[in-house]
């Protein structure tokens, strides 16, 4: 983990503030941010600060080292897969650590949009289902968005790209500089399988 943290600290020297950050674990490290940003005409800078094995127990410290320096406008948090055993043994401590992370982010940047992303649960695992219930509750309690990616969704990225392109071509979105809804970002980044 230390090697990845140092790598992100170096990359932060090149990064710009007010972007979108994916802050997750191993399965998020390979999200193709550049291609998805271009394909869906996302104007904000996007950065992936995901770390293999990232635990909610270490999340605040890792956030401070890897994410806070670039003062993101939006953070998409996808943490919990590495915490399944911790959750099983200490569910209330898991909740407290997650809420601590969200409160910490808000204390550093009150205007930061935060989305808590569920764990994928394509096999209907009861433990993951329970973790996702906790994540939903935590997101609601902390007044954050909740992105549910637990089940496979029927989604056609090509038709979404065509719709976005058409809307931009006729001038409805780009001139207004509207922020993309967080759920759209979640769908684009976490439900698009290459």
Residue ranges of model-derived segments:
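Serine-esterase "nucleophile elbow" of acetyl-processing enzymes
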Residues: 1-52, 57, 62-71
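Alpha-helical cap/lid subdomain in secreted, periplasmic
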Residues: 38-42, 61-194
């Amino acid at each position: 983990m230390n090697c990845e943290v140092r790598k992100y600290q170096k990359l932060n020297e090149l990064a710009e503030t007010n972007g979108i950050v994916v802050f997750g674990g191993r399965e998020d490290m390979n999200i193709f941010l550049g291609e998805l940003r271009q394909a869906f005409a996302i104007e904000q800078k996007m950065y992936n600060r995901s770390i293999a094995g990232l635990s909610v127990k270490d999340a605040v410290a890792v956030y401070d080292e890897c994410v806070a320096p670039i003062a993101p406008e939006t953070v998409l948090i996808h943490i919990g897969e590495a915490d399944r055993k911790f959750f099983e043994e200490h569910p209330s401590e898991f909740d407290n650590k997650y809420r601590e992370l969200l409160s910490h982010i808000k204390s550093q940047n009150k205007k930061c949009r935060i989305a808590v992303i569920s764990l994928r649960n394509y096999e209907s695992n009861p433990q993951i289902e329970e973790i996702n219930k906790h994540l939903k509750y935590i997101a609601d309690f902390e007044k954050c968005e909740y992105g549910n990616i637990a089940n496979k969704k029927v989604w056609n990225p090509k038709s979404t790209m065509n719709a976005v392109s058409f809307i931009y071509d006729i001038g409805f979105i780009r001139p207004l500089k509207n922020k993309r809804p967080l759920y759209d970002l979640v769908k684009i980044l976490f439900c698009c399988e290459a």
